[in-house]
Swiss-Prot record:
Binds 1 zinc ion per subunit. Residues 242-533 are annotated as: Catalytic. Keywords: Aminoacyl-tRNA synthetase, ATP-binding, Cytoplasm, Ligase, Metal-binding, Nucleotide-binding, Protein biosynthesis, RNA-binding, tRNA-binding, Zinc. It comes from Teredinibacter turnerae (strain ATCC 39867 / T7901). One of its GO terms (cellular component) is cytosol. Zn(2+) binds at C333, H384, H510. One of its GO terms (biological process) is threonyl-tRNA aminoacylation. Homodimer. It is an enzyme of class 6 (ligase). One of its GO terms (molecular function) is threonine-tRNA ligase activity. Residues 1-61 form the TGS domain. The lineage of its organism: Bacteria, Pseudomonadati, Pseudomonadota, Gammaproteobacteria, Cellvibrionales. Catalyzes the attachment of threonine to tRNA(Thr) in a two-step reaction: L-threonine is first activated by ATP to form Thr-AMP and then transferred to the acceptor end of tRNA(Thr). Also edits incorrectly charged L-seryl-tRNA(Thr). This is Threonine--tRNA ligase. Signal peptide: none annotated.
Length: 637
């Protein structure tokens, strides 16, 4: 007689073993209809799972946090069923859930076309409308291998052969299609209504370029029509805002094959870059950071001592000279410790905060490169704080204040915080991990900042906090981080003299706010759709004459504003003023100044904004004040 405890604490007693779906039906027919799966004693199970003894049960519906993953995983199987129905000779491989959707890899004799994709999606809809029941069975590993070999699914059989022989495996069947999966899955295909196939791409079998090229079909799936429509709208917005397109449109940067993953900054783009660098230099100096600069190319012996040569060797660019091996630095931390080690430090010197606009190179796979968002050469707003263990909380608190101020200045208010705790493989004592994790959590709690734990996701050398920004169309970008490191300072012989005269190893806090300049600028381009706030705009003002008669005066205005430190250009072309205004509006210049005979006589300018608002006539000095006020707001409303 199982007693089922529900999330609200209420209990229901049943005379016989009962399925999750039947419990839902006992609660009410509406819940039964909405049931996708269940969570029994913390484990996700199918709606048809039988509960034989007392248990805690949560019913998973589309409104549950787990519901969307069940829908997406089940839709991946629906995709595979549709492909096998239309292309029986295709072989299935893997089909995991990813952010916002899923994919499934297929081996097939020819490339899938856009027409194929449309036909597959249509077939998926037909299979959904048939409301085919989904059932589960369990087989020993060797029987599962034989089953998939017998139906010609060699890739699937190969996957199963890599699983230990003593394991049983679950298979899910819907109609005449059966696939390997841990589950859970929806009770029937009729639960899968709101999906869209997005694209086809190539993917190597098992991710190895030496293996066969497969075809990866990407799709998205949602719990309801509204969410699907909203997601597709976000994709349209993201396409319009693609930083690669806007970078070309606004002449900010380019990339080319001769230097893959490395940015060629144009004058306008470099103007944005240097504005950010100057700003970060100022705020870090004001917050007690000492700026340093360390070498680009360092002997392998340092990377061996730091552990990077063993753990990160494939991601490093290396060079040999005079029988010595060097690496172009992929990160700055070992070099910062070398600066710390110059001269014995006392506890009175701590905390010591180093900052570097550190140029790094990582040998990312060419297929992972994406515009300036994922590159091989990048600059970090990198910093390392050397402190005693008992200072971790206060340093994290100070850093968090700085991070929020910076994000607000760039126009970001919505910050998502995650705290990653100890992984299975780690260094340091449990006591030190306990104290460090508590210090990070206490620093966030003391400020009333909401955060979620990511158990086991910390680095091997210590726990970390990650800060992600939500942009204007709802996308989330991980940018900032602060990480506790017990390991590297000891490996590289960092010490300080404690108050009792003993030699102790400092804790090192790795920290960044923007992450990489390249990626952060890409985020800004897309967030603002190229319309940078005035303080960042590569050209803050354009001065335009109506006729040649005002050309000299327009140049005088430009020089006057430029001497005030503003970024100003003039447009003296013999074109109609309406044409000039339209062109510079398209280029998203924040302020457009028009000068005619009247403005020239009155030493004034007619002011328009890129949004098309006519601000009227200002004296040059008054406009300079208006512009200075606008710049001073930075990205804040």
């Amino acid at each position: 007689m199982p007693v089922i405890t529900l999330p609200n604490g209420s209990k229901r007693e049943f005379s016989n073993p009962i399925t999750v779906l039947d419990v839902a039906a006992d609660i009410g027919p509406g819940l039964a209809k909405a049931t996708l799966a269940g969570i029994v004693d913390g484990k996700e199970v199918d709606a048809g799972f039988t509960i034989e003894q007392d248990a805690a049960l949560s019913i998973v519906t589309e409104k549950s946090p787990e519901g969307l993953e069940v829908i997406r995983h089940s839709t991946a199987h629906l995709l595979a069923q549709a492909v096998k129905s239309l292309f029986p000779e295709a072989q299935v491989t893997i089909g995991p859930v990813i952010d916002d959707g899923f994919y499934y890899d297929f081996a097939y004799s020819r490339a899938f076309t856009p027409e194929d994709l449309a036909a597959i999606e249509k077939k998926m809809t037909e299979l959904s409308e048939q409301d085919i029941p989904v059932s589960r069975r369990v087989l020993p590993r060797d029987e599962a291998v034989a089953f998939f070999r017998g139906i010609g699914e060699d890739y699937k059989a190969e996957i199963i052969e890599s699983i230990p022989a003593n394991e049983d495996l679950s298979l899910y069947k819907q109609g005449d299609f059966e696939d390997l999966c841990r589950g859970p899955h929806v009770p029937s295909t009729g639960k899968l209504k709101y999906f869209k196939l997005m694209k086809v791409a190539g993917a190597y079998w098992r991710g190895d370029a030496k293996n066969e090229m497969l075809q990866r079909i990407y799709g998205t799936a949602w719990a309801n029509k509204k969410d699907l429509k909203a997601y597709l709208h976000r994709l349209e917005e993201a396409e319009k805002r693609d930083h690669r397109k806007l970078g070309k449109k606004f002449d900010l940067f380019h990339l080319q094959e001769e230097a893959p993953g490395m940015v060629f900054w144009h004058p306008k783009g470099w103007s944005v870059y240097t504005a950010i660098e100057q700003y970060m230099r100022k705020v870090q100096r004001e917050n007690g950071y000492k700026e340093i600069k360390t070498p680009q190319v360092v002997d392998r012996s340092l990377w061996e001592r730091s552990g990077h040569w063993d753990k990160f060797r494939d991601g490093m660019f290396t060079v040999e000279s005079e029988s010595r091996d060097y690496a172009v630095k992929p990160m700055n931390c070992p070099c910062h410790i070398q600066v710390f080690n110059q001269g014995l430090k006392s506890y009175r010197d701590l905390p010591l905060r180093f900052a570097e606009f550190g140029s790094c190179h990582r040998n990312e796979a060419s297929g992972t490169l994406q515009g300036i968002m994922r590159v091989r050469a990048f600059t970090q707003d990198d910093g390392h704080i050397f402190c005693a263990e008992d200072a971790i909380q206060s340093e994290v608190s100070i850093f968090t204040d700085l991070l929020y101020e910076v994000y607000r200045d760039f126009g970001f208010e919505d910050v998502i915080i995650r705290l990653s705790t100890r992984p299975e493989q780690r260094v340091g004592s449990e006591e030190v991990w306990d104290k460090s994790e508590k210090a990070l959590a206490d620093a966030l709690n003391a400020k009333g900042l909401a955060f979620e734990y990511l158990p086991g996701e910390g680095a091997f050398y210590g726990p970390k906090i990650e800060f992600s920004l939500k942009d204007c169309i709802g996308r989330v970008w991980q940018c900032g981080t602060i990480q506790v490191d017990f390991s590297m300072p000891a490996r590289l012989d960092a010490q300080f003299v404690a108050e009792d005269g003993s030699r102790q190893v400092p804790v090192m806090l790795h920290r960044a706010i923007l992450g990489s300049f390249e990626r952060f600028i890409g985020i800004l381009i897309e967030n603002y759709e190229g319309a940078f706030p005035p303080w960042l705009a590569p050209e803050q003002v354009v001065v335009m004459n109506i006729t040649d008669n005002q050309a000299e005066y327009a140049e005088k205005v430009r020089n006057s504003l430029q001497n005030e430190g503003f970024r100003v250009v003039s447009d003296l072309r013999n074109e109609k003023i309406g044409f000039k205004i339209r062109e510079h509006t398209i280029q998203k210049v924040p302020y457009l100044l028009v000068v005619g005979d009247q403005e020239m006589e009155n030493n004034s300018v007619a002011v328009r904004t890129r949004e098309g608002k006519d601000l009227g006539t200002y004296s040059v000095d008054d406009f300079a004040t208006l512009l200075a006020d606008s710049v001073a707001k930075r990205g804040r409303a």
